[in-house]
Structure formats: C-alpha cells, structure tokens
Amino acid sequence: MDIILASGSPRRRELLSRVQLEFTVISVDIDETPYQDESPEDYIVRMVAAKAEAATVQLNRQLKNNDAHIYQSLLSKPIILLTSDTIGVLPDGKTVLVKPNNREDAYRMWQQMSDSTHEVWTAVQATQLSLQPKRSDEFNNEQVWQIINQQQIIERTEVTFVALTLEMMSDYWDSGEPADKAGGYGIQGLGAAWVSRINGSYTNVVGLPLAQTLALIKEMNDTDTL
C-alpha cells in the first residue's frame, strides 16, 4: 500500500525519508487546544484521530473537485494514512506540554522541566483508506475514501534536563527554534544542550518513533494481504 503522511512537520518527513520510505505529504490544520482536565493519553489519541479525519475529508474534497492529480497513482489501491502528535508530560503525569504560545509560556514550561525528568509522548495512527461507493449516492458510481482499518501506538521517552538559567532560556527563545515544538525545544537542534540523559527512543523525541512506526506500517500491510 502507498503511504500518505498527513503532517506539516519537516522533522517527521526527514525521519521517514532517512529510511528511503516513499510517501506523499499533505498538511492538515486542526484545533490542538487541550480540553480542561483532559489526560495526556486522551489528548494525544484525540489529536491523531482528528488529524486522520481531517486528512480524509481533505482527500475526498480533492477527489470531488478533480484536484487529485498528484494522487492519481493512489486511486487504484488502498492507502495508509499516517498521522502523529507529540507532547511533553510533566512528572505529575497530568500536565501536557504542547507548543509554546509566546516567550512567557515557554519560560513557564522550561522552569517546570529544569533539572528534572519529563516524558515525551508520541502517538502514531495508521489509517487504511480504500475507495468505496458513496453510501448516499450508490447509483451514480461516485466513490469516496473510507476508513477500513486503523491502529494506534503511543511511545514514551524519558528526558532529563540540566538546570536552566534565565540567560539560557532567553538565548534559546531568541534563536527561534522553540516556537513550533512540543515542550518548546528540539533535541535535534540547539535544545540538545539542555538534555543530560534520555531513556527510550531518540526519534520519538524528535517527533516520530521511527522503528515503532515502521513496524506499524508493516503490520498494516501484512493485515491487508491476509
């Protein structure tokens, strides 16, 4: 099955490209605001499911508008739609760290992570889509992408920070790197200087647990051949 990565993250694209996986990219936009008292697991599962739903709607809109020329090679067989979301979780197991809204928000998160260990969670959903007759229009031969199978995984990695000073936080924010990253840091960039130890998947902290994602894709492909 061909693969569509529904993500605007350049880091996820880079990780999949490293293993020479062929895939098409689309970007989706959803509201990523956590609900009040929503647990980290409930939040991250909701995010990847919402991204998959938004991507499916987008693919069907392009199909209806005959604007799917870049996906023509995908129209004759099922596809795997990959969606992913990464968050930080404080030691209390309840506080979700998403992308900082501004400098003050970033400082607040970093102060909570300073000289301590937090977790980075990434959820990945593989959704198998197949072209099926539109249920409400069975006599016009119109087809739409419909979900026929989906699986999720959640990977957790422990990350320990050094003690952070105000100068370190100020310099890092001014670098421009933190703004689009969960927890406000990038372990693959300047943020690596803050990390004294990790326990678990490094690529999970970057934004996609690579080995686990490839295993999920293989499992989905194997299921399709049964």
Curated annotation (Swiss-Prot):
Summary of the function given for this chain in its UniProt record: Nucleoside triphosphate pyrophosphatase that hydrolyzes dTTP and UTP. May have a dual role in cell division arrest and in preventing the incorporation of modified nucleotides into cellular nucleic acids.
Site feature Important for substrate specificity, where: 11, 86, 188
Enzyme nomenclature, EC number: 3.6.1.9
Family to which the UniProt record says this protein belongs: Belongs to the Maf family. YhdE subfamily.
Subcellular location: Cytoplasm
Biological source species: Psychrobacter cryohalolentis (strain ATCC BAA-1226 / DSM 17306 / VKM B-2378 / K5)
Gene Ontology cellular component terms for the protein in this record: cytoplasm
Reaction equation(s) it catalyzes: dTTP + H2O = dTMP + diphosphate + H(+); UTP + H2O = UMP + diphosphate + H(+)
Entry protein name: dTTP/UTP pyrophosphatase
InterPro entries linked to this entry: ITPase-like_fam (IPR029001), Maf-like (IPR003697)
Keywords for the protein's UniProt record, in alphabetical order: Cytoplasm, Hydrolase, Nucleotide metabolism
CDD domains: Maf
List of catalytic residues: 85 (proton acceptor)
